[in-house]
């Protein structure tokens, strides 16, 4: 598996498909001593000279940047009659190239159409095909008229314009009313809605099945086969999801991930079908009374209505599996091409890896991808042009690579101007990639387009024209835990006038569930920090003065002293890792301390050498980053004590890192005595809640817990 991409890097590494993961070294930079071994070692056993740069991003033949250039978008026709005339005239033109014909087996109920890859790249006939044709998109208009279109789902906003203005005014002034409550299953709910001075907004009542939802008939026929009885959590959240509330769900687990994935896929499919049917119905109305000046505002600037942001290609495959089982299409164009380029087999050597690791990195773990989907009455088309697509599935890096160009004239993000439902799944995994890409994408949602792209402005909704689309957009975020970065997204980008929900679990505490045969002392050292900006500096000063000095004194006894080796220093931030590593390598205070360093950029060879030296005692200490553990899940042997420069974001990592103390049964008693010491400040409140538990008050002084039975003691 390739090394992960570093924070702040835009194009440093793509976790690509297996067999194509190369390395490139950082050129033109002097080597830096990243480790120190005992002086009696030979030259060949020294630490790593320089950290390896992550490999370059592979170019994607299936969805290159050119595939999504704005200049090749399809042009919408004002009238279906004109569209048919254009098609007829094109077919009569013998001078131009003949239109491509696709052979379809009409005897089969489901047909997969394979389109050659070059046809996806600037095929003028394909790009200029009309959006609506009698053959594939016009459904029974009587059925369309019979179905009610909900107010939040592409309805006529004219009657609610005054209410919308009041809500937007309240949101702009940060006027939110929040209500907190407890949910069954140890969950906490916070519901916020705009404070307009009117009556309190109530959440919709829980439902117990799909029969309570207004689904399109095409979806209702098959959804019940895959989404059966709701549990208490799903029954409470489903009405809010289908009611177009914003949702931040901070309790995603392996057991509930598939259920919520099916639920939001059903929701976005229902939204796309209802939106399309309203357009078809209004098209019919305008044809029946062509002389009347009808106010039919039912569209956005561009066609894409749904954006789903995912961490890996394999996660995209899982979403497509949910979509295809809910939306039964007779034809699936480029399905084989999709699975060939997006899916892969799991690595058999990962049998001992944790379940959450295998879910995230199993299969194709490439994090640079994008996919357009177009839905018609009979067909799902993979790899459709963005401006022809109803739905876009992509990673943050994949989107940014097509949006952010060095040449400002080539920058293109107009396809995000009319997104009505935005979804982030596995947001905690995106934090370990590069969260800045997520912020960049959301900062470009629902902006006024630079070009018209064939838009019929007489049909564009008023809130798009007024630049208010972000207040009507629904945003759903699913994460295993909530961090300050995710909270910032919740506060700044989730501005839905319908209101927003935040779901968080009640944590028992990771300190109570350790995989150790004996109790272990766990000490939490709090340091003063005046602000989040000054926190790194305050943490470093506390570490060098209060923690590092005793460590250096214990290491002066040399290799013969058992207490002189086996210290693992866990560092969550890569920037803090670089600072501590440089200090250990250059400071006179640590000139007698032998150490190794493993980060997410360390080469495989240097990782193996550092682990060997640490286990043998030639390295007294080993620096180890959280992102390294996230991407690798190493089992570090030889650990006798753990110093946590900061507590991990992921509470699962606490048990895994502390569990290193028990990997050597012979030294378990000594390791338990060495124990764990973790540094924290008041700005680590969210992380500390997951570690010590929701009901435990965050300690104000040095504190330790023993493993079994759980006890609590304050050290004066």
Swiss-Prot record:
Residues 1-112 are annotated as: Disordered. Residues 60-72 have a biased composition (Acidic residues). It holds the Pfam family Utp25_C. Residues 18-27 have a biased composition (Basic residues). Signal peptide: none annotated. Keywords: Nucleus, Ribonucleoprotein, Ribosome biogenesis, rRNA processing. GO terms for molecular function: rRNA binding; U3 snoRNA binding. InterPro entries: P-loop_NTPase, UTP25, UTP25_C, UTP25_NTPase-like. The gene is UTP25. It is found in: Nucleus, Nucleolus. One of its GO terms (biological process) is maturation of SSU-rRNA from tricistronic rRNA transcript (SSU-rRNA, 5.8S rRNA, LSU-rRNA). Component of the ribosomal small subunit (SSU) processome composed of at least 40 protein subunits and snoRNA U3. Its main location: nucleus. This is U3 small nucleolar RNA-associated protein 25.
